[in-house]
Regions:
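Peripheral, non-catalytic segments flanking oxidoreductase cores
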Residues: 1-223
């Protein structure tokens, strides 16, 4: 079945099974690669299923994030991103982004990345996006989030390897540059909005992402 027929009420975005990237033969890998490439070229967004990430891990990640955001504000601010040398940590509601329509934003975040040791040469050289993460003192938080980061990063590399094939690029043309990625994992907590909310208060201001590939994990729960 072609991806054009695998849509539902979520804005008509294509739903693509990537099982063939993990377990298929060369022909199946090519088919999925072409489906991903076509969706990326024609729409710019697509959804995937059969990604291979344990659903229990995904649920544990949501729970870990919820436990952090439920902490008192003073506790969360101990991990404030402004205290970090490499853009890691808590981003409070009051932090305003460089978006024209983001006057009173209604979300908070926690930013992480590839967890490198504090003696990493790039970190010591002042690289502002590489280095150690800031970890809240919550039981199991580091272990769960670290595992999720590694698995979602591996999925991103797999999708990029498929796009290499679709674009006719040599194997590794993209993925060979991902050995020490600056990939960011952002845990987000959105405040539930009323239908009559003031339009100056937004969940997320209009913006574009700078990454090669953005992966968004959708949660059924409000916020």
């Amino acid at each position: 079945m072609s991806w054009q027929n695998q849509t539902d009420t979520l804005g008509g975005l294509p739903l693509i099974s990537v099982k063939g990237l993990r377990y298929g033969d060369r022909a199946q890998f090519q088919q999925v690669a072409d489906e991903l490439g076509h969706a990326a070229r024609e729409i710019g967004f697509f959804r995937i299923c059969d990604h291979g990430i344990d659903l229990a891990l995904i649920e544990s990640t949501y729970q870990a994030a919820a436990r952090f955001f439920a902490l008192p504000d003073a506790t969360k601010r101990r991990y404030y991103i402004g205290l970090s040398k490499n853009h890691r940590g808590y981003v409070p509601f009051t932090e305003k982004g460089d978006y024209a329509d983001e006057v009173n934003r209604s979300y908070e975040a926690f930013d992480l990345g590839l967890d490198l040791p504090d003696d990493d040469p790039d970190f010591l050289a002042g690289n502002r996006v590489l280095g150690p993460n800031i970890w809240p003192e919550l039981a199991g938080f580091k272990e769960t989030i670290s595992q999720y980061y590694m698995q979602i990063s591996a999925l991103g590399r797999l999708v990029c390897s498929a796009l290499e094939l679709h674009l006719g690029l040599p194997t590794g043309a993209m993925t060979d540059h991902m050995t020490k990625p600056v990939s960011q994992l952002r845990l987000l907590h959105y405040v539930r909005q009323s239908h009559t909310k003031d339009h100056s208060s937004v969940n997320m201001g209009a913006h574009t992402d700078y990454e090669c590939l953005t992966q968004i994990g959708a949660c059924a729960a409000k916020g």
